[in-house]
């Protein structure tokens, strides 16, 4: 039967993405169920959306921006000859969204903080939920997320209590600093962090109460290295080890 969603927040694309993310009662990650089809309709009451805490909108913005960064996963660029047409389509849409986020994100969060419904708010709501969900759909739920989102899952798993106060996109953005470095673009981390800072986001694991010298950080590294997003080569192990520093070094 047809199904629909009525999201009251634009903090994630969960309402339209063809998957269900699961957690334990304690809040640790429990994996995802993936579906062949998304819901039939999404109805958003924009009078509700424009009055949500701007932190939710900012988190959804960072989650949306993550798509372009994570689709690259280890590549310095995405070329049609190298990837499936579905993933190339996902990247093209994600790249468009990234540029709109750069242009309109701050205005949208400012307007939401004032409870005003503006074009910027409508644009960002559409990107956060519909477009991010489409990116997930055209890539069949695989390939549009990688190390940034996997870092989120592992932080929820290994540092469950520390992660509890923080939103999905806030932790994903920290993981995407690692992702940028792994993609071969460490020079992009500083401007990306500047954008995070301008959105009042935490920048590092320390900012969300995690000790980067904790023994559990090695568990996080090993789980990332043995994740489906990583070919287990010596070269990738060295690249990932180096990229891990960007989870904490500000």
Q: Where are the language model's segments positioned?
A:
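A glycine/threonine-rich phosphate-anchoring loop and its flanking beta-alpha core
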Residues: 2-90
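Short alpha-helical scaffolding segments that buttress acidic/His motifs in well-ordered protein cores
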Residues: 65-69, 121-135, 176, 196, ...
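C-terminal charged capping/lid subdomain of soluble metabolic enzymes
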Residues: 77, 185-250
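Intrinsically disordered or highly flexible coil/loop and linker segments, enriched in small
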Residues: 74, 78, 110-114, 134-141, ...
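A short secondary-structure junction motif
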Residues: 68, 72-76, 108, 131, ...
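Active-site segments that bind and position negatively charged phosphate/pyrophosphate groups
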Residues: 81-195
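Generic structural signal for hydrophobic core residues of well-folded globular domains
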Residues: 68, 72, 155-159, 179-183, ...
């Amino acid at each position: 039967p047809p199904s629909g969603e009525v999201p009251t927040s634009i903090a994630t694309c969960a309402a339209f993405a063809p998957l269900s993310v699961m957690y334990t009662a304690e809040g640790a990650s429990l994996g995802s169920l993936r579906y062949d089809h998304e819901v039939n309709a999404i109805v958003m009451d924009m009078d509700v959306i424009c009055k949500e805490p701007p932190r939710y909108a900012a988190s959804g913005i960072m989650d949306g921006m993550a798509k372009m960064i994570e689709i690259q996963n280890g590549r310095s660029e995405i070329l049609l000859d190298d990837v499936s047409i579905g993933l190339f389509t996902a990247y093209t849409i994600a790249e468009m969204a990234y540029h709109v986020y750069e242009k309109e994100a701050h205005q949208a969060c400012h307007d939401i903080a004032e409870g005003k419904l503006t074009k910027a708010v409508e644009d960002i709501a559409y990107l956060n939920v519909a477009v991010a969900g489409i990116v997930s759909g055209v890539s069949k739920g695989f390939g549009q997320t990688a190390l940034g989102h996997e870092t989120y899952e592992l932080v929820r798993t290994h540092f469950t209590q520390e992660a509890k106060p923080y939103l999905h996109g806030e932790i994903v953005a920290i993981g995407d600093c690692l992702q940028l470095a792994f993609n071969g673009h460490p020079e992009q981390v500083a401007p990306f962090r500047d954008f995070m800072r301008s959105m009042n986001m935490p920048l590092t694991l320390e900012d969300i109460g995690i000790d980067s010298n904790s023994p559990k950080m090695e568990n996080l590294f090993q789980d990332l290295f043995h994740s489906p997003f990583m070919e287990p080569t010596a070269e990738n192990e060295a690249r990932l080890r180096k990229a891990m520093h960007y989870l904490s070094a500000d």
